[in-house]
C-alpha cells in the first residue's frame, strides 16, 4: 500500500510502509503547507526529489541535504546542493535512471524554466517517473502540454501528478488533454491556488478526467490517499 500525502502546492510525501520520499520540499514559505519543517524532518524521508530549481520547488532542500538525506535532481541542482553542504546529492540528467533500495527515479523532459532564487542556472526542468511502493508514478513538475508525453504514457502509469494552475504552467483544460497521452489510472492535480496567478480550478480538471475515464483525486493540503 502506497500512501500519498499532499503538503500543498506541488509538495508531496510518499510512504510505502518501509521507505519515504519527499517530492519538492517547499515547506517554509508555502502558504498551503499544513505542517512545519520540523514535522517533515521527523518523518525521515529516504530521499528528496526535485524537478527544477525554482524556489517553490527547491524550498527547504538544503535543510534535508545537509542532514544527509540524498537530494536527487539534475546535475546542476545536485552540484548547487553539494556546494552548499548537501554532500549526498545525486546528479542526473534527462533519460537517466537512479536506482536505490526504495525503488527508482527517471528524469523526463518538461517545458518550463529552471533557476535558483539567487539567479543561478538550475539546468533543464524535468519531470520524474518514480517506481515506488509497487506503483509507477509520473510527476510532471512544472510544464506545458507536449506531444512526447505519449511516450511517458507508454510506461503504463498508475498515477500522474499534473500542474493545473495556469499562468506559469498548463491550466486544467490543457492538463486534461495530457490524460489522452499519459493514460494514467489515477491523476492528482497540483500547483494551483497557492498564489493569486494560479487560478486553475481542480473541478474543471476533474471533469476533464471524467470525460476520459480517468479517476481524478483532488487532495486538500494535509489529505492522504492510497494506491
From Swiss-Prot:
Could you tell me which SUPFAM superfamilies the record lists for this protein? Metallo-hydrolase/oxidoreductase
InterPro entries from the entry? Metallo-B-lactamas (IPR001279), RibonucZ/Hydroxyglut_hydro (IPR036866), UPF0173 (IPR022877), UPF0173_UPF0282_UlaG_hydrolase (IPR050114)
Regions annotated as coiled coil = none
Q: What are the alphabetically sorted keywords of the record? A: Hydrolase
Report the transmembrane regions from the record. none
Give a Pfam family name. Answer: Lactamase_B_2
Q: Does the keyword Hydrolase apply?
A: yes
Q: Which molecular-function annotation in GO is an example for this chain?
A: hydrolase activity
Can you tell me which family this protein belongs to? Belongs to the UPF0173 family.
Name of the protein? UPF0173 metal-dependent hydrolase DR_0006
